[in-house]
Amino acid sequence: MSTPARKRLMRDFKRLQQDPPAGISGAPQDNNIMLWNAVIFGPDDTPWDGGTFKLSLQFSEDYPNKPPTVRFVSRMFHPNIYADGSICLDILQNQWSPIYDVAAILTSIQSLLCDPNPNSPANSEAARMYSESKREYNRRVRDVVEQSWTAD
């Protein structure tokens, strides 16, 4: 069944295949265009460098008028990522706009990795460490990066 949301997701997927932004990839699951798996690679020259972080994106029939539910499947240590993997990012909540596509969502999340907002913490320990002890924070991030290599 073709709906506006499904047509838009097909367009997003096509664009992602034809012009993939650096360091991200994503695709719908084989039998469900409304559920995507994605990977964000840790940006070079950052504590996240070398990491491979898996996410899931769940779209509703209201897409693109409503944002998807996005979660990290990989374990993360970041001021704006909750323990369950959900992400505190303005464009996924109150700043959502239908102009955002899957590539824009994933690129924004990749940027958030390196540029957290400690004023809106989802993980208070990570936010405190990021603000008070950058060295210790970076060490914890490196641990998460190393775990990303062996996690399923």
UniProtKB/Swiss-Prot annotation:
Pathway: Protein modification; protein ubiquitination. Ubiquitously expressed. Residues 119-152 are annotated as: Disordered. The active site is at C88 (glycyl thioester intermediate). Residues 131-145 have a biased composition (Basic and acidic residues). SMART domains: UBCc (SM00212). One of its GO terms (molecular function) is ubiquitin conjugating enzyme activity. Keywords: ATP-binding, Nucleotide-binding, Transferase, Ubl conjugation pathway. PROSITE patterns: UBC_1 (PS00183), UBC_2 (PS50127). It catalyses: S-ubiquitinyl-[E1 ubiquitin-activating enzyme]-L-cysteine + [E2 ubiquitin-conjugating enzyme]-L-cysteine = [E1 ubiquitin-activating enzyme]-L-cysteine + S-ubiquitinyl-[E2 ubiquitin-conjugating enzyme]-L-cysteine. Accepts the ubiquitin from the E1 complex and catalyzes its covalent attachment to other proteins. This is Ubiquitin-conjugating enzyme E2 1. It comes from Arabidopsis thaliana.
